[in-house]
Amino acid sequence: MTNTEIFEKLTNAIVTQNIAGCVQLTQEALDAGIPPIDIITKGLSPGMKIIGDKFEAAEIFLPQIMMSAKAMSSAMEILTPELEKSKVEGEETGLAITFVAEGDIHDIGHRLVTTMLGANGFEILDLGVDVLNENVVEEAAKHKGQKVILVGSALMTTSMLGQKDLMDRLREEKLRDSLKCMFGGAPVSSKWIEEIGADATAENAAEAAKVALNIMK
């Protein structure tokens, strides 16, 4: 199989919730010498994007998302140790506080981004899913004075709206200027980021790591 064929099969395995197939193909891709980052960005992530789009359009429902997420997680169990091996050592990149917005429990994109940030030298503080804005502000306050980036994700438009409230709270608490804010997820656009006064968004996990490194310079 060519690399392109492997990527297409991986994408299809995610979309069809084929957990065993996803694991097998991920291992085959590694054995073929494909870099873990390419397996994620060209094979797995496109599958999750399709699933996210289908969910937004009400073509599929939560059980299918959970099964696709399980396929993705199973692949990441194989890939994370490989990503760790290529981790950037000795660079003081900063602290990434990662979380999924209140009312949202979709953590697959969040976990991917968290993994990629860690692999790129960030210290990670993962607050998990369905996180209240006040908890994010509290953690940001604890680390005032450090190099900090907040990285929040939301799969649903309803939970995305909470990002504006978070930005307002950070400004009220005089924390906004001391940190960077990046948000992602299917409904998040550059226009939205500009509207709420955040710093950046990214198309996928690998891009998120690059963007985060760039804005933390």
Swiss-Prot record:
Cited SMART domains: B12-binding_2 (SM01018)
This protein's record includes keyword DNA damage: no
Associated pathway: One-carbon metabolism; methanogenesis from methylamine
Domain B12-binding N-terminal: 1-91
Biological role stated in the UniProt entry: Acts as a methyl group carrier between MtmB and MtbA.
NCBIfam families: pyl_corrinoid (TIGR02370)
UniProt cross-references to PANTHER family, sorted A to Z: METHIONINE SYNTHASE (PTHR45833:SF1)
Official protein name in the record: Monomethylamine corrinoid protein 2
Annotated organism of origin: Methanosarcina acetivorans (strain ATCC 35395 / DSM 2834 / JCM 12185 / C2A)
